[in-house]
């Protein structure tokens, strides 16, 4: 995934700008979203960086064709689905390793569930690299993983995507109960 001057890269949770700086050198434009106003103001030092100060979940994302982010883990799931509601070519995203394993899980594996189905319905997804917690200067409590996400046409047609997502949520939330009950309780 090489960047060039034609790329507009979205970065969510830009923080102090370590990644932003690297992206700004290679991409035509970087859109950096950062919730902390102090950190956000320090991102203005690059000519080709548009800074959006605020909560990524409350912002409309401007047009971008790539997203490269060290996502805040607390919003991994909602931000991923918000991203997948936009048109873009490719994402390189850092997640908690456990979350990443669920994203890429195959049917029948213990990590397979609603997240796997919902993400894989909208994108090809693969873990590129595991990042051990000790690789960070202030180590988090968990290992991380770098995931490549490539949106594509859905592999099968669902007439009502909202219902489909509710349905798989119901099915997986009550995995141990009989599926029939789960469906009756949640689909009505």
Per-region residue spans from a language model:
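Arg/Lys-rich, often Gly-containing low-complexity segments of ribosomal proteins
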Residues: 176
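Catalytic cores of RNA-modifying enzymes
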Residues: 1-166
């Amino acid at each position: 995934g090489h960047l060039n001057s034609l790329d507009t890269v979205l970065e969510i949770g830009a923080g102090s700008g370590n990644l932003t700086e690297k992206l700004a050198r290679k991409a035509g434009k970087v859109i950096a979203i950062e919730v902390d106003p102090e950190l956000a103001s320090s991102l203005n030092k690059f000519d080709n960086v548009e800074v959006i100060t605020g909560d990524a979940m409350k912002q409309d994302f401007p047009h971008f064709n790539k997203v490269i982010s060290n996502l805040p883990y607390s919003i991994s799931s909602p931000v991923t689905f918000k991203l997948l509601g936009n048109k873009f070519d490719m994402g390189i995203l850092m997640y908690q390793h456990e979350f990443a394993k669920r994203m890429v899980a195959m049917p029948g594996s213990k990590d397979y569930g609603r997240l796997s189905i919902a993400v894989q319905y909208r994108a090809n997804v693969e873990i590129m690299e595991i990042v051990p917690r000790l690789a960070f200067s202030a180590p988090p409590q968990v290992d991380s993983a770098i995931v490549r996400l490539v949106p594509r046409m859905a592999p099968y047609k669902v007439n009502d995507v909202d219902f489909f997502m509710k349905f798989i949520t119901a099915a997986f939330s009550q995995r141990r109960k009989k599926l029939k009950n789960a469906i009756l309780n949640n689909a009505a």
